[in-house]
Design a protein with these regions (language model features):
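Active-site loop/oxyanion-hole signature of alpha/beta-hydrolase fold enzymes
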Residues: 52, 56-91, 95, 260
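Conserved HGGG/HGGXW glycine-rich cap/lid loop of the alpha/beta-hydrolase fold
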Residues: 8-64
Length: 271
């Protein structure tokens, strides 16, 4: 797999390449889950050009060097990846989309923006907490207690896998657990975002001069889509697609619908 790094350590790994000039940069959610979580999304996308899996420095398996502070330039360091390649379309899942909307310097540097199961502000978080209280998962609660007592990678992985019923529809639970079980979790990235971003976030820009794809699973229980009802986000450049029968990773339950949405988005980009 071809791998490139920006000067600050943003990692871009080439997933696939078809004929065409576009460069698709896929940014994972979490944070701390790693771009490996978007492998199935990249597999589902039948788009022209190159698809790259992107990890911020210190996120997922993109580990920082000893003594460095990989989070010092989060999330603005995303600009470096956009400047490293021509004809870039950024796609951010969940918190990844929030990081993109917190980086106004991207304006004028990208040809399109895909926002996948994400939100324009942090109002999604109390709604998520309320959902977990309405529909508790005892195994998740036990895993949280174990991780807090002993914050190992094994305990963190167990915790996330125990949340699968919130993330996936029943028919996709086996695939969802397998996905969550093989991710390179990064506790430091999770802790940084919780302390410095997740509870303060509000979008710092909204592009109106490039195509925007807003895509979400119609049964996503993790990130509420309610805040998108604000009129400033109902601009003519937006392609909005609810993916039927899908949760927080809609390409797992319904890859065909996700593929079709990206095909329509590509038509908008290429004119």
């Amino acid at each position: 797999m071809t791998t490139r790094y920006t000067r600050s350590g943003v990692r871009m790994r080439l997933h696939s390449q078809r004929e065409g000039i576009l460069n698709w940069l896929l940014l994972p959610g979490g944070p701390g889950i790693g771009s490996e979580s978007l492998q199935e999304l990249a597999d589902a996308m039948a788009v022209p050009g190159a698809i790259w899996l992107v990890d911020l420095p210190g996120d997922g398996s993109n580990l920082a060097g000893e003594g460095s502070d990989p989070f010092a330039a989060w999330p603005q360091v995303l600009l470096e990846a956009a400047e490293a390649l021509p004809d870039v379309i950024y796609a951010g899942h969940s918190t990844g989309g929030m990081y993109l909307l917190s980086t106004p310097a991207l304006h004028g540097r990208i040809r399109g923006l895909a926002l996948l199961d994400t939100a324009p502000d942090c109002s999604w978080h109390p709604e998520y907490v309320a959902m977990t209280q309405r529909d508790p998962l005892p195994a998740f609660d036990r895993a949280v207690a174990a991780y807090e007592a002993d914050p190992t990678l094994q305990h963190l992985t167990t915790l996330v896998v125990a949340s699968a019923e919130w993330n996936f529809e029943p028919a996709a639970l086996a695939a969802g657990r397998e996905l969550l079980g093989r991710m390179p979790y990064n506790g430091a990235a999770i802790a940084w975002s919780d302390a410095h971003f997740d509870h303060l976030y509000c979008a710092q820009w909204w592009p109106t001069d490039i195509p925007v794809l807003r895509l979400w699973g119609d049964n996503d229980r993790i990130v509420s889509q309610q805040a998108w009802q604000a009129p400033q986000y109902a601009t003519d450049n937006v392609v909005a697609r609810a993916i039927p029968g899908a949760g927080h990773f809609p390409w797992i339950e319904n890859p065909a619908a996700v593929r079709a949405a990206f095909a329509d988005f590509t038509v908008r980009i290429l004119g």
